[in-house]
């Protein structure tokens, strides 16, 4: 299989209260930056042949150096991200298309991952890549542990309670056949439409292509708030013991 990973790592971590424009991807877990763990998983996934990273301008050279020194040979491109996450993914898609136009083989599938999710496992990446080729799109998710309620029309009060059995919490990496993801992003760019994840774009522009669920456990967290850091250290320790 020939799949390319896009890692969106341009976030400044506003909810982490880091200040000074620091990036949550550069916080350390187990002695290594969050983004190091993220890249390592894709480096070790057999399905992934190339990795494109979009990050803040001031971190481009840092990540290139990190990849080189860590032996992350699949990292072929580190570029500046955009204003929004979707813009960063779009920058990587354009880079992939430019490389294909220059003679490099176009990947069969593209997986888009959050740089702040360091605990996805190589075998999970391979499974999502395979499902995305088989079904056109595949997205990891897990079942919510809490009851989910809608916000009501009256400020400060709940509305209806949703049936938890019909809900999933969506994660990344989200995998797609390359042409589906590329066309969805191109159409969204033409319309100036933004979504919170790539699956939402594919749902809109390819409604006849249902997205295959890949159900995961609860280890694949996104580091978003300060409370996530001790949890991340615990997950890292647990996963390290299993290796």
UniProtKB/Swiss-Prot annotation:
The keyword Protein biosynthesis does not apply. The record marks 15, 24 as: Transition state stabilizer. It catalyses: 2-C-methyl-D-erythritol 4-phosphate + CTP + H(+) = 4-CDP-2-C-methyl-D-erythritol + diphosphate. Pathway: Isoprenoid biosynthesis; isopentenyl diphosphate biosynthesis via DXP pathway; isopentenyl diphosphate from 1-deoxy-D-xylulose 5-phosphate: step 2/6. The record marks 164, 222 as: Positions MEP for the nucleophilic attack. GO terms for biological process: isopentenyl diphosphate biosynthetic process, methylerythritol 4-phosphate pathway. This is 2-C-methyl-D-erythritol 4-phosphate cytidylyltransferase. It comes from Chlorobium phaeovibrioides (strain DSM 265 / 1930).
């Amino acid at each position: 299989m020939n799949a390319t990973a896009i890692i969106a790592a341009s976030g400044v971590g506003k909810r982490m209260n880091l200040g000074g424009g620091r990036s949550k991807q550069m916080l350390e877990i187990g002695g290594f930056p969050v983004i190091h763990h993220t890249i390592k998983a894709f480096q070790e996934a057999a399905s992934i042949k190339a990795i494109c990273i979009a990050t803040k301008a001031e971190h481009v050279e840092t990540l290139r150096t990190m990849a080189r020194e860590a032996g992350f040979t699949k990292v072929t491109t580190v570029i500046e991200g955009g204003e929004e996450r979707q813009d960063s993914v779009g920058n990587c898609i354009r880079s992939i298309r430019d490389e294909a136009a220059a003679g490099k083989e176009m990947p069969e599938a593209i997986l888009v991952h959050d740089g702040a999710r360091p605990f996805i496992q190589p075998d999970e990446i391979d499974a999502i890549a395979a499902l995305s080729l088989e079904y056109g799109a595949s997205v990891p998710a897990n079942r919510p542990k809490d009851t989910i309620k809608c916000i009501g029309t009256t400020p400060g009060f709940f509305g209806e309670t949703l049936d938890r059995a019909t809900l999933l919490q969506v994660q990344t990496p989200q995998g797609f056949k390359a042409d589906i993801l590329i066309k969805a992003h191109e159409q969204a760019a033409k319309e100036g439409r933004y979504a919170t994840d790539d699956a939402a774009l594919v749902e809109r522009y390819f409604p006849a292509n249902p997205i295959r669920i890949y159900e995961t456990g609860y280890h694949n967290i996104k580091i978003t708030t300060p409370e996530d850091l001790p949890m991340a250290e615990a997950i890292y320790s647990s996963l390290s013991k299993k290796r």
